UniProtKB/Swiss-Prot annotation:
InterPro entries: Reticulon, RTNLB17/18/21. It comes from Arabidopsis thaliana. Residues 149-163 have a biased composition (Basic residues). It is a multi-pass membrane protein. This is Reticulon-like protein B18.
Amino acid sequence: MDSTTTPPSLRSNTRSALRLARNNKTLVKSHIPSLDLVLLSPKNNNGTPYPSPVSLSSPSSPVTLREILLLSPSPLRKSRTRLSNRFDMEAAEAAVTARRSKTKGGQNGLLASPSPRNFRRSRLRSEAMVDTKENTEPIVVVTDEKKQNQRKQKKLGRSKKEKHSSVPLLASPSPSSDQPQDVCQGDLERIRENISDLIMWRDVAKSTLWFGFGCICFLSTCFAAKGFNFSVFSAISYLGLLFLGVSFLSNTLRQRVTEEARRELKLSEDDVLRIARRMLPITNLAISKTSELFSGEPAMTLKVAPFVLMGAEYGYLITLWRLCAFGFFLSFTIPKLYSCYASQLNQKVECAQRRFVEAWGVCTHKKFVAGSAVTAFWNLTSLKTRFIAVFIIVVVIRYRRQNLQLDSEDEEEKKQQEKTHPEQQKSPEDKSTSPRSAEEEQALVLVAETKAPKKLY
């Protein structure tokens, strides 16, 4: 018979037959049939059942061994997925073997039938591939579980990070406590800048508006309140009377008769803390300024002492209203005038000091003049003024001594610099002398050139 290729369905049956032949050598003693010559359909039309081993051992069995081997299932029970994978692999290998047979036997025009060895090799390869797939499947599942665990851990990590990030935001009161102080300091600086702009007349329109409004208010009160004597106690009494009348009117209009409906005004700790935070920068500024004024330095003492003395001597004439009026007018006039005429005033003061020193140096009877001045002051003044005069003289002496010490220290530093760097100081002097000499020579040449034509004429 001509050799023809077997379909894939028969290949699987031949494999199962070979497997049974290996396992049942004791039962099967008949001759091994040739698989290449006989071809039978995989389906049994007669519907004969599977025979028993006893009937197989008998030689006169109606069913041939070929049919039994083809119809017998495989002894190994495999899963459906494994069988489907095996059939797919076998179909793919059958296509590959068909292509190989076509390439080899294409010249003769015949299809070569595969040998049993090729079936065995393909079967071993398919089983090896299925085993590797089965071995790799749990690994894939593990990796998937790891990925899922990693994703869960990432989500948990993110939630923990969000919790950690949200906790300090909720439990960090330090920035909130620092914010009111910064706001108050910013408000104070803004108020200070606005006041300095008004006093120094940087914005002329705004300064003139405020100055005119203040002048009208103070002048109107001076003319209208001639017989009015101001006192703090009377002012508080008038304010209390006004508040009492307003509260009575509000009570009658709203008809609040019952005590239960009345509102109780109480201050809480938050209110006190809020007020303290608002007042803290102002109090710190006042304390710092007072500490600067009363620091005890000679220069600052000489500046503050005259104002304190005037307040002590003429304090009974100064009232709150007059103080506000004088402060208003002086604040709008003195700073601007001093900034404009500061250089001229300093020159005049220096000239007066120079003249006094020259007159004192020219005077021949210095001791007599000094003694007469001291005795006249001592006899014409009171004990209080004597004490104040002695205090001021001591402050002046200390101020003078401090200035002398500073001048001596500056001179010593200059001498040390001259000793340490004599060459560096000489070199710029030499450089400065050389251009001066060149300039002088050029000036002399120009003068000579200008004078020469005059002599000719």
